[in-house]
Amino acid sequence: MEFKHYSVLRDETIENLNIRPDGIYVDGTLGGAGHSYEIAKRLSDKGRLIGIDQDADAIKAAGERLAEFGDRVTIVRSNYSDMKNVLHSLGIEKVDGIMLDLGVSSFQLDTPKRGFTYRSEDAPLDMRMDDRNALTARDIVNTYSENDLYRIIRDYGEDKFAKNIAKHIVAARQKQEITTTGELNEIIKAAIPQKVRATGGHPSKRTYQAIRIELNHELDVLRDNLDDMIDLLNPGGRICIITFHSLEDRIVKSNFKKNENPCTCPPSFPVCVCGNKSKGTVITRKPILPSEKELEENSRSKSAKLRVFEKNDL
């Protein structure tokens, strides 16, 4: 199956990266290389693009798609959390732009055996972005305590029926192991009142999101590495991040704001004495959203938000 990933907010991201032909750029979530292709074709022979992804299918597809650019492009199978080490191994200390597209790819959603989608009834409960990891969604569903299931569905899925869903999962697995998306869907459906199911979208959506985030440590990786990525930027360099739900967006918004104004002095102080220096400027006071045209062409873009931060000239 061809690796597909509609490049959400592609033109807006490319425009905000301010690409210089001889610059060095990093795509930390390479996917199908839709964004990376647009970056690479704007580079001269002196420019470089480093693409990072933990998904083996993405690495293969991106390698084929970007082959025409030759040595201009380097692809590395890793998590963007290891960006600094990846760049160091390539002899690169600073870059001119970084982008992250935090969405699950269309390929991942549309390949049932990957277990990301609740729309398939007989897929295995997998959800690993990196299949080298041992833990799967099946392990979480069948081994986490009721309290831990409740916690992740509440915190990562923001589902008001989290407690009941966790209770139903634990009750069901005591009879037999839960192994497929279809089995999990039926359990979740039974835990949500019928009148809510009729109007609230697919009942499994929030629980699947919660399990996926927990399994792949998505929020921890984002939260723990934003500061380091900003530090990797040259003066005037930009980081562009596309998020797909409020949990991610809040982390990015808060981090960019903190790096723009890190002062911890009380408001009553006439001058700053804490010594914390601004690293740059938030370019997007409000996030950039998909155009009407994009929303018509790709319904999966509807929750996307792009935020941009520019490193200070030191």
Curated annotation (Swiss-Prot):
Pfam families for the chain: Methyltransf_5
Main location: cytoplasm
Any one Gene Ontology BP term: rRNA base methylation
Localization: Cytoplasm
Reactions catalysed, as given in the entry: cytidine(1402) in 16S rRNA + S-adenosyl-L-methionine = N(4)-methylcytidine(1402) in 16S rRNA + S-adenosyl-L-homocysteine + H(+)
Keyword Methyltransferase assigned: yes
E.C. number(s) listed in UniProt: 2.1.1.199
Keyword presence, Transferase: yes
GO CC annotations on file: cytoplasm
EC category: transferase
Keyword list, A-Z: Cytoplasm, Methyltransferase, rRNA processing, S-adenosyl-L-methionine, Transferase
InterPro entries noted in UniProt: RsmH, SAM-dep_MeTrfase_MraW_recog, SAM-dependent_MTases_sf
Domain of life where this protein originates: Bacteria
Single GO term (MF): rRNA (cytosine-N4-)-methyltransferase activity
Ligand binding (S-adenosyl-L-methionine): 33-35, 53, 80, 101, 108
Region (Disordered): 293-314
PANTHER family, A to Z: 12S RRNA N4-METHYLCYTIDINE METHYLTRANSFERASE, S-ADENOSYL-METHYLTRANSFERASE MRAW
Function: Specifically methylates the N4 position of cytidine in position 1402 (C1402) of 16S rRNA.
Family under the similarity heading: Belongs to the methyltransferase superfamily. RsmH family.
HAMAP family the UniProt entry points to: 16SrRNA_methyltr_H
Protein name: Ribosomal RNA small subunit methyltransferase H 2
Source species taxonomy: Bacteria, Bacillati, Bacillota, Clostridia, Lachnospirales
